[in-house]
Amino acid sequence: MENLPEPLRVVAQELAKLPGLGPKSALRIALTMLKMPKEKVTGIGQSVIDLREKLCICEQCASITDTCPCRICSDPKREHDKLCLVSEWDSLLAIEEMGLYRGYYLVLGGLLSPLDGVTPQHLEFQKLEERLEKGEVKELILALGATVDAEATASYIKNMVESKYPGIELSRLAQGIPIGSEVKYTDKETLRQSLEYRQKL
């Protein structure tokens, strides 16, 4: 990239800092922007600035929002006794897009990972305890995934809820063999969970 004109090189280098974009892809995007009308490029730049300036973290659920509290937390028609715990905001979006769940959410901001130095203090566990202490939540739904870190986080939450809030029902998303898969190709852990959480017919 050293042979590129300075402004083009700088834009390509900045774009390459985004996850999933390598130097070549970043350069292609920069060249595409160079071909666009000035107003469109200015619009893209302004929208990126607005992204940082006009969004905030909801004080109740820790999701990304442009209003505080967010639209979900402000909705009185939601089921107050259900709280769905997700690791990141995009998980909340995925669940919300299905339109099946009508309770509230809390975004943890990640998963516990001792190897990476992520402890309960780095996540929204204090906010979780504040929500549970109010006494409105009757069911806590863990929608954290099926990774090793998700299992560690679920175990930590289970121990906390059982010791401090024994009246709260704890559930998690069902896990098992995906639709369209065959048993013989399923990994051992997925197969174990499928057997453990088997359903009656």
From Swiss-Prot:
Disulfide bonds: none
Keyword annotations of the record: DNA damage, DNA recombination, DNA repair, Metal-binding, Zinc, Zinc-finger
GO BP terms in the entry: DNA recombination; DNA repair
GO molecular function: DNA binding; zinc ion binding
InterPro entries listed in its UniProt record: DNA_Rcmb_RecR, Rcmb_RecR, TOPRIM_dom, TOPRIM_RecR
Keyword Secreted: no
ZnF locations on chain (C4-type): 58-73
Record-annotated Toprim domain positions: 81-178
Protein purpose: May play a role in DNA repair. It seems to be involved in an RecBC-independent recombinational process of DNA repair. It may act with RecF and RecO.
Family: Belongs to the RecR family.
Protein name per Swiss-Prot or TrEMBL: Recombination protein RecR
Source species of the chain: Maridesulfovibrio salexigens (strain ATCC 14822 / DSM 2638 / NCIMB 8403 / VKM B-1763) (Desulfovibrio salexigens)
Organism ancestry: Bacteria, Pseudomonadati, Thermodesulfobacteriota, Desulfovibrionia, Desulfovibrionales
Gene from which the chain derives: recR
